[in-house]
C-alpha cells in the first residue's frame, strides 16, 4: 500500500493480485479530506514484455475497441487488455505519453526511453470514506463489486495464513513482508518445471538459485512439501542426464549445462531438507540421489571440464567463465578469470562428501559411509594445503596447479568454507576467513565480489554496458553472500546474535523501496549502495529468511 498526502488530503492506494485469477486490482481509499475531491485515473498501455520499450509513438498502433460506462478494452501490438473502474465517468481523450525515461535500466543492451499510449481517463467525485476499485486484466472483466470484496477478503486471509504457516516468528512488519514476498517466487501448480523462480523480472528456472534459496523460501516458511517437490523434480532431471545437474531449464524445457557446482548445491539443499524434516523412509530416494550425484563427481564430467584429482579436489580444466557463478563476459572479455581449483566448488565438494557419509550411515550402507569418510579426510587435507594463504590468513579464491603464481585477490567465495555445515578448514582458519571478509568485503547489503584495494575494483554499476557487466563481479555486493557470512559469523561467535540482527537491520529500509517486501539481486559495493538486477531475488530473499530461521529465530 501507498499513502498520498496532499495538504489535508490522505489517499491510500493498495494493489493486490487474487490467486488463480488473471487480473490485478487497485484500491483507492480516501482516508481524509475536508471536502469532496475529483480523482482522474488515466490508464497507460504498453503491451510489451519487461525487457522492451516502445521506441517511438506510432499512429494506429493502439485502438479503443470497447467502451461502456467505466469499462474499456484496448487492442494493440497483438494483445488485448481491459480496464474497469467500479464507479466514475469515462472520457475519451487519446494521447501518447512520450519520452518516459526510466531512472535505472539493468537490462543489458536495451534503451531506457519509453512511449505509452492512453485512450482517456475515468473521472470520479469522491468524499472522505469512499472507496474506488480498478481492475486490470488481459481478459474481459465480469467481476462485480461483491466479487471484488470477496477476493480482497481472500487475499487478506491468505496473507494471515502465510504468517501462521511460517516456521519462524514474524517479529516485525519487515519480516512479515519478506515471508509474504517469498510466495511470489514459488509456483505451486502441477507443472514439471521447477517450482522456484530465480526472481523478478528474470523469472527463470535455475538449479543453483533453487537450491541456495530453498531452505529460506520453503523450509523457513512452512512449505516442506514444496521443498520436497523441488528436490524430486531436479532429481528426475539429473537422473535423465547421467546424474549431472544442469545449470538451468530453457523455455523449451531443454537442459543447459554450464557451471560445475550445481549438483553440489543439490546435496546442500537435500541436507537442509533432511535436517528439517528428519531422516524418513519416504525420503530415501532424495538421499540416494544426493549420493549418486556425489559419486558422479568422482568420475570426470567432460561437458563441465571437471576432473576429480588424486588429492580428492575438483579441478576445472577450462577458462570458460560459465563454469562458475561469476560468469560475466564484457565486450568479449572474461570479467573474472578463474580455473583449476575453485574455492567454493571444493568447499561444497567436501560438504557433499560429508553429507553423503551421513546419508550412507542413515541407510545402513557402512562400506559407502567409510568410503565417503576416507575421501572427505583426504579432501580436507588437500584443501587446507592448496587454498590457505598464510600471509593474509585467508583462502585463495582459485589455484591453477599449472601456473607459477597464485591470484591473491580477496573474493567472497571463501566464506562458504566457513559457513557450510561441514567445513574443510580448522576453526582458526575459519575465523581468519570471517575476519578478512568483514574487514575487506562487508557492506551494508552484502559481500563485495572483490577487495576494494584491487586495481580492477569497480564498485558501482554505471557507464557503458561493458563497465556495468564488469562491476557485477569486480566490486558489487550480493545479499545471498551476506547470508552465508552471517551464518559463518554466528557459527564461531554463537553468543553475538546481537550483531547478527545488526547485519540484518539495513534491509528494513530496503524492503520499503522498489519491490516492496523484496530483496534485490545485488547492490553497488560503494555508497549509496544502489540496488541492481532482479528487484526480487530468490537467492537474496531465501538466504536472509534462512538466517532468520536457522540462526536468529530463537534469540529473544
Feature locations, PLM:
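Extended, loop-rich substrate-binding clefts of extracytoplasmic carbohydrate-active enzymes
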Residues: 1-19, 100-103, 110
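A short, charged helix-loop
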Residues: 319-337
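Extended, well-ordered alpha-helical scaffold segments
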Residues: 40, 147-163, 170, 174-178, ...
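Solvent-exposed loop and edge beta-strand segments that line ligand/cofactor-binding
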Residues: 117-123, 193-211, 250-263, 331-347, ...
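Catalytic cores of carbohydrate-active enzymes
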Residues: 176, 245, 298, 302-309, ...
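Glycine-rich, acidic and aromatic/proline-enriched surface loops and short helix-turn segments
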Residues: 180-191, 232-240, 509-516
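Aromatic-rich carbohydrate-recognition surfaces in CAZymes
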Residues: 32-33, 54-57, 126-128, 204-210, ...
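Acidic/polar, glycine-enriched structural segments that form the non-catalytic walls/loops
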Residues: 21-23, 29, 33-204, 280-281, ...
Amino acid at each position: 500500500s501507498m499513502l498520498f498526502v496532499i495538504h489535508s488530503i490522505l489517499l491510500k492506494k493498495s494493489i493486490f493480485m487474487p490467486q488463480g485469477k488473471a487480473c490485478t486490482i487497485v484500491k483507492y481509499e480516501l482516508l481524509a479530506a475536508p471536502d469532496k475531491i475529483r480523482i482522474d485515473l488515466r490508464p497507460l498501455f504498453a503491451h510489451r514484455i519487461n525487457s522492451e520499450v516502445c521506441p517511438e509513438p506510432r499512429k494506429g498502433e493502439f485502438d479503443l475497441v470497447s467502451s461502456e460506462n467505466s469499462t474499456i478494452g484496448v487492442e494493440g501490438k497483438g494483445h488485448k487488455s481491459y480496464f474497469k473502474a467500479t464507479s466514475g465517468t469515462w472520457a475519451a481523450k487519446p494521447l501518447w505519453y512520450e519520452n518516459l525515461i526510466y531512472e535505472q535500466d539493468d537490462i543489458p543492451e536495451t534503451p531506457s526511453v519509453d512511449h505509452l499510449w492512453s485512450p482517456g481517463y475515468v473521472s470520479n467525485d469522491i468524499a472522505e470514506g469512499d472507496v474506488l476499485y480498478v481492475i486490470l486484466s488481459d481478459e474481459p472483466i465480469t467481476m462485480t463489486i461483491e466479487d471484488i470484496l470477496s477476493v480482497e477478503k481472500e487475499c487478506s486471509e491468505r496473507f494471515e495464513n502465510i504468517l501462521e504457516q511460517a516456521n519462524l516468528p514474524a517479529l516485525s512488519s519487515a519480516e512479515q513482508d519478506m515471508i509474504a514476498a517469498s510466495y511470489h517466487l514459488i509456483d505451486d501448480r502441477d507443472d514439471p518445471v521447477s517450482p522456484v523462480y530465480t526472481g523478478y523480472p528474470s523469472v527463470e528456472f535455475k538449479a543453483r538459485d533453487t537450491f541456495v534459496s530453498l531452505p529460506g523460501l520453503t523450509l523457513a516458511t512452512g512449505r516442506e512439501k514444496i521443498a520436497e517437490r523441488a528436490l524430486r523434480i531436479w532429481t528426475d532431471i539429473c537422473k535423465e542426464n547421467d546424474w549431472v545437474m544442469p545449470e538451468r531449464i530453457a523455455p523449451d524445457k531443454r537442459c543447459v549445462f554450464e557451471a560445475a557446482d550445481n549438483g553440489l548445491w543439490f546435496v546442500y539443499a537435500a541436507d537442509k531438507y533432511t535436517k528439517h524434516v528428519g531422516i524418513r523412509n519416504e525420503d530415501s530416494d532424495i538421499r540416494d540421489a544426493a549420493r549418486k550425484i556425489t559419486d558422479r563427481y568422482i568420475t570426470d564430467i567432460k561437458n563441465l571440464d571437471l576432473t576429480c584429482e588424486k588429492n580428492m579436489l575438483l579441478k576445472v580444466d577450462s577458462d570458460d567463465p560459465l563454469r562458475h557463478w561469476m560468469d560475466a563476459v564484457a565486450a568479449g572479455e572474461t570479467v573474472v578469470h578463474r580455473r583449476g581449483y575453485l574455492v567454493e566448488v571444493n568447499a561444497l565438494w567436501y560438504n557433499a562428501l560429508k553429507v553423503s557419509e551421513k546419508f550412507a550411515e542413515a541407510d545402513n550402507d557402512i562400506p559407502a559411509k567409510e568410503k565417503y569418510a576416507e575421501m572427505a579426510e583426504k579432501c580436507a587435507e588437500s584443501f587446507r594445503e592448496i587454498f590457505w594463504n598464510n600471509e593474509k590468513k585467508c583462502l585463495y579464491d582459485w589455484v591453477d596447479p599449472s601456473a607459477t603464481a597464485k591470484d591473491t585477490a580477496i573474493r567472497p567465495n571463501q566464506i562458504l568454507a566457513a559457513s557450510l555445515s561441514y567445513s574443510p578448514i580448522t576453526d582458526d582458519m575459519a575465523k581468519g576467513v570471517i575476519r578478512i571478509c568483514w574487514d575487506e568485503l562487508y557492506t551494508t547489503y552484502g559481500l563485495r565480489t572483490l577487495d576494494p584495494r584491487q586495481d580492477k575494483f569497480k564498485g558501482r554499476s554505471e557507464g557503458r554496458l561493458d563497465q556495468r557487466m564488469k562491476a557485477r563481479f569486480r566490486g558489487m555486493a550480493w545479499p545471498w553472500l551476506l547470508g552465508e557470512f552471517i551464518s559463518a559469523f554466528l557459527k564461531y561467535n554463537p553468543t553475538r546474535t546481537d550483531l547478527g540482527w545488526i547485519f540484518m537491520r539495513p534491509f528494513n529500509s530496503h524492503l520499503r523501496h522498489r519491490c516492496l517486501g523484496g530483496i534485490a539481486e545485488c547492490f553497488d559495493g560503494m555508497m549509496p549502495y544502489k540496488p541492481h538486477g532482479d528487484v526480487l531475488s530468490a537467492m537474496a530473499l531465501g538466504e536472509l529468511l534462512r538466517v532468520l530461521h536457522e540462526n536468529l529465530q530463537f534469540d529473544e
